[in-house]
């Protein structure tokens, strides 16, 4: 039976604040801070536990091998000898944000009846551009069943940032849906990371029906305001689109196109007069997981920052007492990820699949999360300062930490 499974990226032992992500305001504002990898990973595990308790199927991906010595070798250097900016890019733990791992089209949408996944190339940012080989290996292992078709990345220079710029509307996760690809147009101070050509290539690969596939331009105002991915200003679930007024370049045309393709859509729009774009981005209101609850209705799994931003929380409280589709609010603490620019939705990749077709090593239950938390508590560094990235001792420690996790999960082939 098809159901939506959220696969969260386990936050890796090299989690640090190097400020590598241009256009990501949180990342830039925390550059040079001391990170807490152990606390970060435990926060992510607690979010997974929270969603399991809600009755939501939960999976995970393991951290990639970092620092990426082969990538540095291809640049003619090494972890020990690299210039500071290259070393930081090699150490990045950014694969934690699984929403950028791939774009996923469920089987009901594809002409061949398979669930298609295209690994994201992430070419816009150097620190993420070398993620895809490790991510692809993991996707091919987790989704090796014939029910899936896992594709290599779209070729450069066509930038693709995965599911963070992709939404789906449907009457139920197991029903045919309308897929919405959101792209940006270059030209401002901050880069537009999702290219239209990349989105169109993915739609063709995934064998989607053109009549049920939309390409909508992200607002340049949103991009230049710090919404480096669409999931910072909009999120969809089943028949609901939850969006900020400034999310799309031509709001009226976008809404009309969406309604024409999926007439049952409920658009829950937050006006800029109630919640400014700046407050939406600072609180990551829209980088929430909009989920269908087993008992019925929908809920938002939000960062605690949304609760702490009065304009945002006041609007949300007024919304849930109304007669709308979103009825419950669940704040979660992912502050360590938030400080690098990734909220609850960034940390997960949504895959509609029969759990029986997924490699069970990637599916979570309470006992497995206990096992992961035990490895993290024992092996993850408590803190990493920028200067620590030059430490040979830390390098060996984080490698041992990751291998301990792989061993605990019987995933040593990813070593």
Swiss-Prot record:
Catalytic residues of the enzyme: 161, 229, 346 (nucleophile)
Record Pfam families: AstB
InterPro entries the record matches: AstB_sf (IPR037031), SuccinylArg_d-Hdrlase_AstB (IPR007079)
Catalysed reactions, as listed in the record: N(2)-succinyl-L-arginine + 2 H2O + 2 H(+) = N(2)-succinyl-L-ornithine + 2 NH4(+) + CO2
Any one GO biological process: arginine catabolic process to succinate
Chain sites annotated for binding substrate: 18-27, 100, 127-128, 193, 231, 340
Record bears the keyword Hydrolase: yes
EC number of the protein: 3.5.3.23
Enzyme type, top EC level: hydrolase
Keyword Hydrolase in record: yes
MF (Gene Ontology): N-succinylarginine dihydrolase activity
Subunit description: Homodimer.
Classification via HAMAP family: AstB
PANTHER family attached to this UniProt entry: N-SUCCINYLARGININE DIHYDROLASE (PTHR30420:SF2)
Name of protein: N-succinylarginine dihydrolase
Source organism of this protein record: Sphingopyxis alaskensis (strain DSM 13593 / LMG 18877 / RB2256)
Gene: astB
């Amino acid at each position: 039976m098809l159901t939506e499974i959220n696969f969260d990226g386990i936050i890796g032992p090299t989690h640090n604040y190097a400020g590598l992500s241009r256009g990501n305001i949180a990342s830039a504002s925390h550059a040079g801070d001391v990170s807490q990898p152990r606390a970060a990973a435990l926060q992510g595990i607690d979010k997974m536990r929270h969603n399991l308790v809600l009755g939501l199927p939960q999976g995970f991906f393991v951290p990639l091998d970092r620092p990426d010595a082969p990538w540095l070798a291809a640049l003619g250097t090494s972890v020990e000898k690299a210039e500071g900016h290259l070393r930081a890019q090699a150490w990045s733990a950014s694969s934690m944000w699984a929403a950028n791992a791939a774009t996923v089209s469920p089987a009901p949408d594809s002409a061949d009846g398979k669930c298609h996944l295209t690994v994201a190339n992430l070419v816009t940012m150097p620190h993420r551009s070398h993620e895809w080989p490790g991510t692809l290996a993991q996707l091919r292992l987790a989704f090796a069943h014939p029910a899936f078709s896992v594709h290599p990345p779209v070729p450069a220079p066509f930038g693709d940032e995965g599911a963070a710029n992709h939404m789906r509307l449907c009457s139920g996760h197991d029903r045919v849906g309308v897929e919405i690809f959101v792209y940006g147009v270059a030209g401002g101070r901050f880069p537009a990371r999702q290219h239209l050509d990349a989105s169109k290539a993915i739609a063709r690969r995934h064998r989607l029906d053109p009549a049920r596939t939309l390409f909508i331009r992200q607002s340049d105002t949103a991009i230049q305001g710090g919404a480096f991915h669409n999931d910072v200003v909009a999120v969809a679930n089943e028949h609901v689109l939850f969006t900020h007024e400034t999310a799309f370049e031509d709001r009226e045309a976008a809404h009309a196109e969406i309604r024409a393709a999926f007439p049952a859509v409920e658009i829950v729009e937050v006006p800029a007069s109630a919640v400014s774009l700046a407050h939406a981005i600072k609180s990551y209101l829209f980088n929430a997981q909009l989920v269908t609850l087993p008992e019925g209705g929908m809920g938002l799994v939000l960062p605690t920052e949304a609760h702490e931003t009065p304009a945002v929380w006041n609007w949300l409280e007024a919304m849930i007492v109304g007669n709308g589709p979103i009825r419950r609010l669940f704040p979660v603490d992912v502050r360590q990820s938030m400080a690098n620019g990734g909220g609850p939705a960034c940390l997960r990749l949504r895959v509609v699949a029969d759990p029986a077709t997924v490699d069970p090593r990637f599916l979570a239950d309470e006992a497995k999360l206990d096992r992961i938390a035990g490895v993290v508590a024992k092996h993850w560094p408590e803190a990493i300062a920028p200067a620590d990235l030059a430490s040979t001792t830390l390098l060996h420690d984080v490698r041992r930490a990751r291998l301990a996790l792989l061993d605990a999960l019987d995933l040593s082939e990813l070593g």
